[in-house]
Amino acid sequence: MKSRLFIISQYLLPHHLLSRLAGCIAECRVRWFKNAFTAWFAKRYQVNMSEALVEDLSAYEHFNAFFTRALKPGARPLDETPGAILCPADGAVSQLGPIEHGRIFQAKGHGFSAQELLGGDPAMAAPFMGGEFATIYLSPKDYHRVHMPLAGTLREMVYVPGRLFSVNQTTAENVPELFARNERVVCLFDTERGPMAVVLVGAMIVASIETVWAGLVTPPKRELKTFRYDEASRTPIHLEKGAELGRFKLGSTAIVLFGPEQVKWAESLGAGSAVRMGQQLAAPVQA
């Protein structure tokens, strides 16, 4: 009954208004308030501050600075296995596996369209048909920066407007097409394993999504917008494996897509597996 009421509330709540309010609170610089709120959050979610570059909670100018905190050098060593595809973020594997008939598995009884996830462009989605996906959920306690699984050159970025349903096991099992309905930023790269998409999916009270090349991705109008980076007039944007790609200001989910016969997921990983940025997520399929 509680789960049913929670799902009903997800459809009734003003998602974007709540997220804007959360954003205002997260950017508040009133010292006593931001210190108290940050301390409560760190204790409530058992955030490990010993690995943070700045351990003193009161040193952060606002909650968002704490939430997107940098880690100490070496806190997330990169797997050195030749050809290893790295996990892009801390969190847990929600699902991973093949993209079958153009659809990505969400939870028992639910899936969603890979084409819709990527913004609806059939040409962008085509290279991923029959490929592989991994969905990584970032919990409140996690490090909320997203990094490159492989070195790549940015081809395009797509802002896709949408709802801001909460992202958790209950919504994954009860909200159809959850990740293809929420607001998201699609980043398409050319890599040694062919096209790679990294999709940053928003959720309720996710105040914003940033990328290292564009900053806050907040178009003036909430409408689909594509940014091309492969035009001759632009300086190429190349990011090395393990480099920061973007970050969530109050986070959610990162989804990685590869084409067919390119990667093989680590056998030790499955739905619910805890992961850390930099560990091996997959190995390359040998040609």
From Swiss-Prot:
Superkingdom per UniProt: Bacteria
Topology relative to the membrane: Peripheral membrane protein
Enzyme kind, highest EC tier: lyase
PTMs per UniProt: Is synthesized initially as an inactive proenzyme. Formation of the active enzyme involves a self-maturation process in which the active site pyruvoyl group is generated from an internal serine residue via an autocatalytic post-translational modification. Two non-identical subunits are generated from the proenzyme in this reaction, and the pyruvate is formed at the N-terminus of the alpha chain, which is derived from the carboxyl end of the proenzyme.
Cross-referenced Pfam families: PS_Dcarbxylase (PF02666)
Known EC number: 4.1.1.65
Residues at the active site: 90, 147, 252
Annotated site residues (Cleavage (non-hydrolytic)) in this chain: 251-252
A single MF term (Gene Ontology): phosphatidylserine decarboxylase activity
Keyword Nucleotide-binding tagged: no
Co-factor note (free text): Binds 1 pyruvoyl group covalently per subunit.
Reaction catalysis annotation: a 1,2-diacyl-sn-glycero-3-phospho-L-serine + H(+) = a 1,2-diacyl-sn-glycero-3-phosphoethanolamine + CO2
Keywords: Cell membrane, Decarboxylase, Lipid biosynthesis, Lipid metabolism, Lyase, Membrane, Phospholipid biosynthesis, Phospholipid metabolism, Pyruvate, Zymogen
Subcellular location: Cell membrane
Cofactor entry: pyruvate
Primary localisation category: membrane
Any one Gene Ontology BP term: phosphatidylethanolamine biosynthetic process
Membrane-spanning ranges: none
HAMAP family in UniProt: PS_decarb_PSD_B_type1 (MF_00662)
Family: Belongs to the phosphatidylserine decarboxylase family. PSD-B subfamily. Prokaryotic type I sub-subfamily.
Subunit structure, interactors included: Heterodimer of a large membrane-associated beta subunit and a small pyruvoyl-containing alpha subunit.
PANTHER family in UniProt: PHOSPHATIDYLSERINE DECARBOXYLASE (PTHR10067), PHOSPHATIDYLSERINE DECARBOXYLASE PROENZYME, MITOCHONDRIAL (PTHR10067:SF6)
NCBIfam families recorded: PS_decarb (TIGR00163)
Name of the protein this chain belongs to: Phosphatidylserine decarboxylase proenzyme
